[in-house]
């Protein structure tokens, strides 16, 4: 609620202020009135769009449906994901322990998680001389635990930031919405799984998701 209130107030306050100013100037009809009006309207339009985008992202978080589980092969799941990143300048490496491993998942939701993680990893290492992302799977039979990790050789995440990245609407990207990793965490939680991150500044990050195989 605090985050929601803060974001809405940040958008509404300048809109109200500018509206008041434009009304006053319209009455006074001072110099450079046309430029002032245009600048004010542009700001109102931009902040209104920002507020609309925020509300839409909030809806995505609050309306995430319960997963519809169905058996999916790991190889099949990753095969479709691979196609989306074929044209990337980043070198994506896939180390799949068992392509025939079956998972009971909501395929659409899990694809959303993987796309988000691979996209973020690619962006994180894009500026490296040899940008590389490794996707690796493993299965711990005695505990029925399936793991999938996404590791990049990017710049890593700052220590004071790493604990906040799963918080809704928290982002360090200028154009980021801050909901991607929050959605990932929610989806994994709804699947009875988890997601964690380990990162070393200057060396890269590793996101690991864990699912119980039933």
Please place each PLM-identified region on the residue numbering.
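Short helix N-cap motif at coil->helix boundaries in the Bergerat
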Residues: 74, 156-164
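Conserved micro-motifs of the catalytic ATP-binding
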Residues: 64-67, 102-105, 172
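Conserved glycine-rich
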Residues: 192-193
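A conserved beta-strand-to-alpha-helix junction within the catalytic ATP-binding
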Residues: 68-82
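Conserved catalytic submotifs in the C-terminal HATPase_c
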Residues: 91-102
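Histidine phosphotransfer helical core of two-component systems
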Residues: 12-49
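Short alpha-helical Gxxx[C/S/T] motif in the catalytic ATP-binding
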Residues: 180, 184
